[in-house]
């Protein structure tokens, strides 16, 4: 009987171990094991022949790696082919919607977290309507603000090679609508971080002054952004956060009262002195800040990732004056050439 068992076992080797997928290009190295159903070993019947194995139950999803890993949805959502007549079209359509919600959530546009992406797709793309609406703050004076999408950077560089704009990066030929945006962009090539946090034992440096001011709220304990839902008291330090109770609600800026804003306790004497200087400077700047907030919408809420503080507007004015002076010099040079041509052509006409 033992020999009768050896033959069937040799003909039916044990199934291979489940495959292992390594994701090398993800932010963290992740090990994912795809589970498969292992059939029960066949038992010997009366005639010595093994019974046919039962059919395997497919438990591993037929998804490629860009569907398995959420942080790659935005990169490969265009590879998904939707079949309008298929029965699972509604289920497969939730994936690109999740990718769009994930991407917009990273941008800080008030989109819901990725867990709510399926319901966002069922609601008819509310996030896209909010992003394109006039009151979303994404467009101002006809000029698009903030950091462009990654897939449009190459087009912007190609456009800059043939553009007549003088606000151009001399390294990558990309053009910008404002001088201060160009200055901030050049620091991505040079690695310069001129704005240093002077809080005791901090020393972090930033590319833009607005990033420094946002960072210093961690030291001061300020939380100027509140949930716009009525009755919700949740406050946040940054404009690109989501209220856990109301993920679809936008955040609005509301300067906290003195009891809330100055509640942060100092760890030592140096920190206490720094906080005292900070609040003294804030009180001196408060009337100016209120006037600016009335005149225009808060730029940090328009684009938290690339917030440009208004104290850099002097650079833009100086750049405009320099360009105006260059245009005047070109005009004077052209007039001088015309006059010289007239003088040299006068003897020929005589």
From Swiss-Prot:
Q: Which UniProt keywords apply?
A: Activator, Coiled coil, DNA-binding, Metal-binding, Nucleus, Phosphoprotein, Repeat, Transcription, Transcription regulation, Zinc, Zinc-finger
Q: Name one GO biological process term.
A: regulation of transcription by RNA polymerase II
- Residues that the record marks as modified (Phosphoserine) are 310
UniProt zinc finger (C2H2-type) residues? 167-189, 195-219
- Principal place of residence: nucleus
What is the protein name given in its UniProt record? Zinc finger protein 367
- SMART domains the record matches: ZnF_C2H2
PANTHER family per the UniProt record, alphabetical: KRUEPPEL-LIKE TRANSCRIPTION FACTOR, ZINC FINGER PROTEIN 367
Signal sequence interval, chain numbering: none
Q: GO molecular function of the protein, one example?
A: DNA-binding transcription factor activity
GO cellular component labels? nucleoplasm; nucleus
Role of this protein: Transcriptional activator. Isoform 1 may be involved in transcriptional activation of erythroid genes.
- Family indicated by similarity: Belongs to the krueppel C2H2-type zinc-finger protein family.
Q: Where does the record place the region Disordered?
A: 104-151, 290-327
Here the segments flagged for biased composition (Basic and acidic residues) are 137-151, 316-327
| Entries under SUPFAM superfamilies matching the protein | beta-beta-alpha zinc fingers
Q: Which PROSITE patterns match?
A: ZINC_FINGER_C2H2_1, ZINC_FINGER_C2H2_2
Where does this polypeptide localize? Nucleus
Q: Which cysteines are joined by disulfide bonds?
A: none
Q: Name one Pfam family in it.
A: zf-C2H2
Coiled-coil annotated residue ranges, if any: 308-342
């Amino acid at each position: 009987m033992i020999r009768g068992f050896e033959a069937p076992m040799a003909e039916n080797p044990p199934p291979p171990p489940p495959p292992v997928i390594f994701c090398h290009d993800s932010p963290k190295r992740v090990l994912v094991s795809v589970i498969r159903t292992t059939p029960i070993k066949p038992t010997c019947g009366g005639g010595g022949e093994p019974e046919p194995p039962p059919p395997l139950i497919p438990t591993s999803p037929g998804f490629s790696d860009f569907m398995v890993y959420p942080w790659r949805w935005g990169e490969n959502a265009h590879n998904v082919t939707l079949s309008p007549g298929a029965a699972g079209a509604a289920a497969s359509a939730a994936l690109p919607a999740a990718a769009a919600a994930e991407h917009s959530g990273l941008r800080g546009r008030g989109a819901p977290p990725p867990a709510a992406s399926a319901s966002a797709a069922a609601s008819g793309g509310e996030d896209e309507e909010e992003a394109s609406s006039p009151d979303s703050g994404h467009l101002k004076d006809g000029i698009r603000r903030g950091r462009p999408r990654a897939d449009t950077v190459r087009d912007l560089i190609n456009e800059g090679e043939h553009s007549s704009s003088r606000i151009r990066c001399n390294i990558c030929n990309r053009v910008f609508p404002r001088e201060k945006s160009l200055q901030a962009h050049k620091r991505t090539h040079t690695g310069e971080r001129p704005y240093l946090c002077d809080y005791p034992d901090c020393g972090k440096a930033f590319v833009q002054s607005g990033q420094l001011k946002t960072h210093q709220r961690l030291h001061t304990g300020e939380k100027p952004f509140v949930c716009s839902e009525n009755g919700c008291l949740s406050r946040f330090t940054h404009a690109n956060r989501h209220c856990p109770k109301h993920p679809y609600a936008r955040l609005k800026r509301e300067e906290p009262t003195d009891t809330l804003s100055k509640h942060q306790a100092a760890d030592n004497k140096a920190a206490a002195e720094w906080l005292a200087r900070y609040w003294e400077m804030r009180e001196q700047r408060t009337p100016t800040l209120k006037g600016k907030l009335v005149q225009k919408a808060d730029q940090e809420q328009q684009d938290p990732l690339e917030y440009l503080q208004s104290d850099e507007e002097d650079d833009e004015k100086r750049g405009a004056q320099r360009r105006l002076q260059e245009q005047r010099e070109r005009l004077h040079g052209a007039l001088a050439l015309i006059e010289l041509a007239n003088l040299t052509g006068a003897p020929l006409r005589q």
